[in-house]
């Protein structure tokens, strides 16, 4: 897999933080856990259930030492979201996220969660479910 980074951009690989001085292309030759800086969610952005799940999974990717404590939180939040949300498409996506987490495919779960943001926003705008506390 090839990743192109801009000057000053950070890349998180297996818990390590790498900052690039100039534009660079990196080729990952084996399977690693990585996260691009532009996909990193800040704490204050985790305002809904799906975003809180994303944040918990993000912690698992960025800090492997914290994965053991973040994983049960992520699973619990998925269960809460499945109970709270009504749309079939959102529920199916959350079930896929849960399956990815069980298989240890955290990056796959994170990618799926990004795709659920718009569905969650739509459901919240309809006023059918509350946002997370």
Task: Label the model's feature ranges.
Residues 79-133:
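C-terminal charged interaction modules
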Residues 1-27:
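Short, charged/polar N-terminal "headpieces" of proteins
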Residues 46-49, 53, 70, 93, ...:
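Helical mechanochemical/support elements of P-loop NTPase systems and associated helical scaffolds
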Residues 47-65:
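Charged, amphipathic alpha-helical linkers/stalks
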Residues 20-47:
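Short, surface-exposed, low-complexity cationic segments
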Residues 53-57, 76-77, 96-97:
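A general alpha-helix detector
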Residues 59-92:
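Mid-chain, well-packed structural core segment of small domains
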């Amino acid at each position: 897999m090839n990743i192109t980074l801009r000057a000053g951009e950070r890349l998180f690989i297996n818990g390590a933080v790498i900052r690039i001085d100039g534009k660079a292309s990196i080729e990952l030759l084996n399977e690693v856990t990585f996260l691009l800086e532009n996909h990193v969610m800040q704490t204050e952005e985790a305002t809904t259930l799906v975003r809180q799940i994303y944040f918990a999974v993000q912690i698992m990717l960025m800090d492997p030492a914290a994965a053991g404590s973040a994983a049960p939180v992520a699973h619990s939040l998925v269960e809460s979201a499945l109970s709270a949300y009504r749309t079939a498409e959102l529920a199916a996506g959350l079930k896929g996220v849960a399956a990815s987490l069980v298989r240890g495919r955290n990056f796959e779960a994170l990618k799926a969660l990004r795709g659920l943001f718009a569905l969650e926003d739509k459901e919240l705008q309809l006023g059918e479910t509350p946002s997370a506390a």
